[in-house]
Amino acid sequence: MHEHLKEKLAILPDQPGCYLMKDKQGTVIYVGKAKVLKNRVRSYFTGSHDGKTLRLVGEIVDFEYIVTSSNLEALILELNLIKKYDPKYNIQLKDDKTYPFIKITAEKQPRLLITRNVKKDKGKYFGPYPNAQSAHETKKLLDRMYPLRKCTNMPDKVCLYYHMDQCLAPCVKEVTEEQNKEIVDEIIKFLNGGHKEVRSELEIKMYEASEKLEFERAKELRDQIAHIDAIMEKQKMIMSDLVDRDVFGYAVDKGWMCVQVFFVRKGKLIERDVSMFPIYDEPEEGFLTFIGQFYENSSHFKPKEIVVPGSIDSELVERFLEVEATQPKRGKKKDLVELANKNAKIALEEKFYLIERDEERTIKAVDHLGKQLGIETPYRIEAFDNSNIQGTNPVSAMIAFIDGKPAKKEYRKYKIKTVQGPDDYESMREVVRRRYTRALKENLPLPDLIIIDGGKGHLAAASDILEDELGLYIPMAGLVKDDKHKTSHLIIGDPPEPVVLERNSQEFYLLQRIQDEVHRFAITFHRQLHGKSVIQSALDDIPGIGDKRKKVLLKHFGSLKKMKEASVAEFVEAGMPKNVAETIYTYLTDKKTL
């Protein structure tokens, strides 16, 4: 530990506040809060920690702290600091999961809408609904039952909805404020849980229509009742008080936290939200940070009541969110909290089980591959592939797999420099020479296995450079494809002998992933270079276009096709003088063969 850190730790105050952990560049990498700064900050540098926390602590070279007057103030400040610095070790809930609401607009002639964006306007919002289908089914029923206007813009004449008795036609008729209010009140009653009452009213109307021999009307009312029954069946009542509430539960294991939220609306459990993230604080502190961010997210509407587990300070939550927060000791709410806790625990167990299974499969695949090839377990595998089209823009690519997983920071791209024309073998010689000469000079980690995407000639070329020129003896195998360009088998040794793997084995799947990945990486790099060269060669003969302007045009348009479709104004917008823009436009439109 740095000496200045020890000195700062020694003078930490025993007061609430926030702390900001910094790395060697001075970047804030983590923001936390504490009831007692002295105890919390010191805990990072003492005792044992899980792997994730050890990585965080390993990067800390300095910290700052801000003393606050209360835990509530610390919670508010923490959220603001996280938004300001966006530290890489803090959770940041993404605003990408939104739920649909039904909205009654505040227009003079109100409408029913489905929206995922709750605004602070005069409209009335109902929800959230678990999914778009549920919201649309409810709106469709309401549209049939209550004749609010349907059109976004008022038409000049009545539409089909009027003839279906689903609109009062305010476009051509006078619909009073009182009429609209009566309809809106009925809709609100329905959306606030008055399904049974509305159903009873419809039943009475259905029998009346039947007695009057209005069988078509009676059938329509019967269908509406059936739709209400279907909606009620999907939203079983779990609480009788009809209060909108969010019920929270959480679990912590192996440095991860899972928080589950049950959305209860009008007494019905309609949806659940699951969030999982690494945690570096005490569980209670991590939960408070989560719940603060959860309701800052515009897609999460604050209900009338928030229900939290017994370990959480409900008074602090209530003051912070300005919503009633309860900590139930018994009854249905306590049962729901325990159910949320249980679901969170199960979700974490499932996550770790799947991770362990995946790791077990990949490690076994690597181990079995080594045994099949008669070598030590190849924990680090490097694979090479060449790419060119008729010798133009020849490139090569190298990828690395460590413990059976792609290590993308280790990937490398190579422009072929010494080879003229389409010579795959010489290209392979060059790239193997460049890769491992540098590895020796810079003392970089060497692979346990090298895979060359190719046959005997490619393998011989690479082996010649590696062993005869560089004096390296690393196991090397050629990856041979079938006539459909799919993974077939490996060849290894001198002379090369085929090693056939079971096609349904994990080691064969590993080879397929390696082959697909190195090919993808090489071909993507080649296309980038080829696209640039095509554009640049197409621009070579245009007066006034030098290398600098070629780069500007390439960056702005990205492809020759887009340049050929561009107007003079768009070339000017890209930074070309008007006379040059006109020249480019004329040249590219005349050159039909480009």
Curated annotation (Swiss-Prot):
GO terms for molecular function: DNA binding; excinuclease ABC activity. CDD domains: GIY-YIG_UvrC_Cho. GO terms for cellular component: cytoplasm; excinuclease repair complex. Keywords: Cytoplasm, DNA damage, DNA excision, DNA repair, Excision nuclease, SOS response. Gene3D superfamilies: 5' to 3' exonuclease, C-terminal subdomain (1.10.150.20), GIY-YIG endonuclease (3.40.1440.10), UVR domain (4.10.860.10), UvrC, RNAse H endonuclease domain (3.30.420.340). It comes from the Bacteria. Its main location: cytoplasm. Residues 196-231 form the UVR domain. GO terms for biological process: nucleotide-excision repair; SOS response. Residues 14-91 form the GIY-YIG domain. SMART domains: GIYc. It holds the Pfam family GIY-YIG. Signal peptide: none annotated. It is found in: Cytoplasm. The UvrABC repair system catalyzes the recognition and processing of DNA lesions. UvrC both incises the 5' and 3' sides of the lesion. The N-terminal half is responsible for the 3' incision and the C-terminal half is responsible for the 5' incision. Belongs to the UvrC family. Interacts with UvrB in an incision complex. This is UvrABC system protein C. It comes from Bacillus cereus (strain G9842).
